[in-house]
């Protein structure tokens, strides 16, 4: 991180004339000539689309979809908001913080801030052999955070709903893969 990233992130909540209680950072996930952000692109985006199709319109799902990079871990909060937030300690942290902001703050008090045009960070291994590590664990924790929030708002998750969600997610993921491929082809 450099000072300008921190300043960009903190400014909206530090400026007393702004109404923001939370600022969520975002940045392009491009590095070494490839598109990164696998979990956002291949899990979160198609899952949120599939959930909307399966469980119907939920303002919470629209809220999560409104974030350009919902899994960025960079966020700033006004100190008076902290006591009301239950912040997860697993890979569901980013979704959990957004969920807590949804629960405790007015939507217009949350903003998004571009904090860098090129920022890259440590990438996790797929960890296909060990579901308790890497992207496997990350994906599980993120899904749990989303499902728990929806369940706490009254969505009932049954085995049939999960089967339908799985099929719908798969279709949405394939459609997005085609879109990502086309985007990569157009942009070299």
Sequence positions of predicted segments:
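A short, flexible beta-alpha/helix-coil linker loop
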Residues: 28-32, 82-83, 118-121
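Conserved donor-nucleotide/metal-binding helix-loop-beta segment in metal-dependent transferases, i.e.
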Residues: 1-29
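Terminal low-complexity segments of carbohydrate-biosynthetic enzymes
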Residues: 125-188
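Active-site donor/metal-binding and catalytic loop motifs
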Residues: 111-132
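A recurrent flexible, glycine/aromatic-enriched loop bordering the glycosyltransferase active site
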Residues: 29-38, 55-74
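Conserved nucleotide-sugar donor-binding
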Residues: 45-55, 66-85
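Catalytic donor-sugar/metal-binding loop of nucleotide-sugar-dependent glycosyltransferases
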Residues: 18, 89, 99-118
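Conserved glycosyltransferase catalytic-site signature
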Residues: 70, 91-99
């Amino acid at each position: 991180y450099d000072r300008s990233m921190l300043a960009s992130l903190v400014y909206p909540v530090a400026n007393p004339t702004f109404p923001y209680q939370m600022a969520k950072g975002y940045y392009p996930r491009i590095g070494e000539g490839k598109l990164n952000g696998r979990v956002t692109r291949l899990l979160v985006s198609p899952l949120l689309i599939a959930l909307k199709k399966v469980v119907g319109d939920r303002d919470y799902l629209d809220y999560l979809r409104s974030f350009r990079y919902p899994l960025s871990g960079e966020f700033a909060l006004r100190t008076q908001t902290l006591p009301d937030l239950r912040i997860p300690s697993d890979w569901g942290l980013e979704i959990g913080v957004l969920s807590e902001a949804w629960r405790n703050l007015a939507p217009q008090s949350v903003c998004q801030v571009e904090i860098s045009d090129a920022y890259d960070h440590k990438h996790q291994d797929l960890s296909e052999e060990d579901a308790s590590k890497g992207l496997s664990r990350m994906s599980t924790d993120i899904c749990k955070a989303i499902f728990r929030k929806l369940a706490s708002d009254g969505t009932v998750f049954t085995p049939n709903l999960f089967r339908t969600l799985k099929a719908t997610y798969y279709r949405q993921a394939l459609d997005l893969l085609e879109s990502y491929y086309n985007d990569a082809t157009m942009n070299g």
